[in-house]
A protein has these predicted regions:
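Short conserved segment of the HATPase_c
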Residues: 82-104
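Conserved, non-catalytic sequence blocks in retroelement Pol enzymes and Pol-derived host proteins
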Residues: 85-90, 291, 322, 469
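Residues immediately C-terminal
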Residues: 53-54, 81-82, 515-516
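GHKL-family ATPase ATP-binding module
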Residues: 1-14, 21, 43-45, 53-55, ...
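Conserved short strand/loop->alpha-helix "switch" segment adjacent to the catalytic nucleotide/phosphoryl-transfer site
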Residues: 26-45
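C-terminal interaction appendages of subunits in large macromolecular complexes
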Residues: 390-409, 424-429, 440, 444-446, ...
């Protein structure tokens, strides 16, 4: 890297150790969120965050992440290398301090890093504590330094193992089987999505991810390289690739307001949904916060002022609301904050008050300039806002109908709902079943103490293509709202989902195991993602997995959920075995449906969660939206994985 910023010395004296490691192995979830799939991947993010911090300081422009054959991870950067000199206070190498003390690192020394990433901010020492083995290799001062640890403890002092003119840090770690008992298998897709996101958020950095467990047809290991020259502008194009823009190009700005670095990029499209993605120091703030509030304030006030002065609102008979300015808007807000304060349920809501005015001012200035210089686009945006206001007005009446019907007790429940007798929502589950015939079988097969059945007639409305009032007028969707007991509107937000009277804590989508069933599942999931995302985020949405085959021979029978499983059973049963392919739930009798799909002791339910909101938004838009080419490309790319009924 270049010599710029070298005046800020990064040495052993920059390292501050805040506390010991005692708690990490005993209470890992306090440090990395959980010890399941998310926590496992979070280890990688913590190590990569160190490299990103170097990049933010201008010291690093290449980061490489490798999933090794044994599911260990190697990360490498071309930064300055972690200091290796003796730490004054601790009396050991600064590298050992960084690797073995929680919170130790240059990110707590304001001269070394102005801002720093990492949601939990626990750093690489936490990764070390939760790894059965970790080796840190540092390229610095013309030498190669190395130290190996087991479960957070150094096996020997830092030693030199060679000479090199390179600079940087290389870390290889293997998660500890004693901690990660659920899985230690890394998902290439999950890591790849995060690396792509980081490349967009930090333009000019080359990030490579390689999977040494899998080879391409060329014989090379599976690998991708991400480099974004335009940052958020390219990120918007990526997120909106399957939507049709209504303005000529992305509106973007980058600068500093009141000491807060702010980056914003936005575009309007023909969709009816609002897609705002906010980041603080590269962390995706799902719950929003002061930066998002500042964006909304700046957007609404500037567009309202322009719309009023343009005369285009003169014939409108009702007030424009803030939501109207955000329909069909895709925007990314990224801020860098020296000492972020996180709040909210998952600590992903920014609380720093000074950020609101900084973002609001930045957005106002950006939009004022853009609207002045692009009058045609300005007019298009205002017309879109007017249409949104008219649709909102119509949707309000439809929403009130849903509200009234839902609030009614007893008699307000849909006629088709076969309810359960249990009153405690935490113990209750409802199955959303496709079609009346399958619904009938499910009603006979269920345990009516705690299992309710709501049959859905055919394919529900594709909400991705529908205006809001059409969604609330749709009978099947109204039945879902009413059956679940979910209402719209809280004290804080008239449009927010109110889960206070949710009647079931397991909402199970149960569709046929064929192409039509998958389509219906996707339609229902699209509805939940766009209109009831809180249910997904709270862990209430599940997908049932009915078997694909019944394999029989004489009195012996067993079920198969995949072709491989079917083949194994046929081999096990020997010649004379027969196979029945279940194309629909209705082909099973009530006892079979209970045994395979509904019995809590035997069934497999897949919980629906959102790892990456931006990617989920992009995929729903691509699969269910208007644009055909991206969908065709996706299907061609993934056809190999599909189980298609002909």
């Amino acid at each position: 890297m270049s010599e710029e910023n070298q005046n800020k010395q990064y040495s052993e004296d920059s390292i501050q150790a805040l506390e010991g490691m005692e708690h990490v192995r005993m209470r890992p979830s306090m440090y990395i969120g959980d010890i399941g799939v998310r926590g496992l991947h979070h280890l990688v993010y913590e190590v990569v965050d160190n490299s990103i911090d170097e990049a933010l300081g201008g010291y690093c422009d290449e980061i490489a992440v490798t999933i090794n054959e044994d599911n260990s991870i190697t990360t490498k950067d071309n930064g300055r290398g972690i200091p290796v000199g003796i730490h004054k206070k601790e009396g050991v190498s600064a590298l050992e301090v960084v690797m073995t003390k929680i919170g130790a690192g240059g990110k707590f020394d304001k001269d070394s890093y102005k801002v720093s990433g990492g949601l939990h901010g626990v750093g690489v020492s936490c990764v070390n504590a939760l790894s059965e083995q970790l080796t840190a290799t540092v390229y610095r001062d013309g030498k190669v330094w190395e130290q190996t640890y087991q479960r957070g403890k150094a096996l020997e002092p830092v030693k030199t193992v060679g000479e090199s003119s390179e600079t940087g840090t290389l870390v290889t770690f293997k998660p500890d089987a004693e901690i990660f008992i659920q899985t230690r298998e890394y998902s290439y897709e999950t890591l790849s999505l995060r690396m792509r996101e980081l490349a967009y958020l930090n333009k000019g950095i080359t990030i490579t991810i390689t999977d040494r467990r899998e080879k391409e047809e060329s014989g090379e290991f599976k690998s991708e390289t991400f480099l974004s020259e335009k940052g958020l502008v390219e990120f918007i194009h990526f997120l909106d690739e399957s939507r049709e823009a209504i303005i000529s190009d992305v509106i973007a700005m980058e600068g500093e307001k009141n000491g807060v670095p702010v980056e914003v990029a936005m575009i309007y499209n023909t969709s009816y949904s609002e897609n705002l993605h906010s980041y603080v120091n590269n962390i995706n703030t799902h719950e929003g916060g002061t930066h998002l509030a500042g964006f909304r304030r700046g957007l609404t006030s500037t567009l309202k002022k322009y719309a009023d002065s343009s005369g285009l609102l003169d014939k409108l008979k009702f007030e424009i609301a803030g939501d109207d300015f955000r329909e069909g808007l895709t925007a990314i807000i990224s801020v860098k904050v020296g000492e972020p304060q996180f709040e909210g349920q998952t600590k992903t809501k920014l609380g720093n008050r000074e950020v609101t005015s900084a973002v609001s001012q930045a957005v106002s200035e950006m939009l004022e300039n853009y609207l002045e210089e692009n009058p045609n686009d300005a007019k298009t945006i205002v017309q879109k806002v007017i249409l949104a206001a008219q649709a909102r007005h119509a949707a309000k009446k439809a929403r009130e109908m849903v509200q009234r019907k839902t609030v009614m007790s007893g008699g307000g429940l849909p006629g088709k709902l076969s309810d359960c007798s249990e009153q405690d929502p935490a113990l209750c589950e409802v199955f959303l079943v496709e079609g009346d015939s399958a619904g009938g079988t499910a009603k006979q097969g269920r345990d009516r103490n705690f299992q309710a059945i709501l049959p859905l007639r055919g394919k529900i409305l594709n909400v991705e293509k529908a205006m809001q009032h059409k969604v609330f007028e749709n009978e099947e969707i109204r039945n879902i709202y009413t059956a679940l007991g979910v209402t719209i509107g809280t004290e804080e937000d008239s449009k927010a989902l109110n889960l206070e009277k949710l009647r079931y804590h397991k909402v199970v989508i149960m569709c046929d195991a064929d192409v039509d069933g998958s389509h219906i599942s996707t339609l229902i999931l699209t509805f939940f993602f766009r209109y009831m995302r809180e249910l997904i985020e709270s862990g209430y949405i599940y997908i049932a997995t009915p078997p694909l085959y019944l394999v029989k021979k004489g009195q012996k029978k067993d079920y198969a959920w995949s072709d491989d499983q079917r083949d194994r059973l046929m081999q096990e049963f020997g010649s004379g075995s027969s196979v029945q392919r279940y194309k629909g739930l209705g082909e099973m009798n009530a006892e079979q449906l209970w045994d395979t799909t509904m019995n809590p002791q035997e069934r497999t339910l897949r919980i629906v969660n959102i790892d990456n909101v931006g990617e989920a938004d992009r995929v729903f838009s691509m699969l269910m939206g208007d644009e055909v080419p991206p969908r065709r490309e996706f299907i061609e790319k993934n056809a190999i994985y599909a189980n298609i009924d002909v």
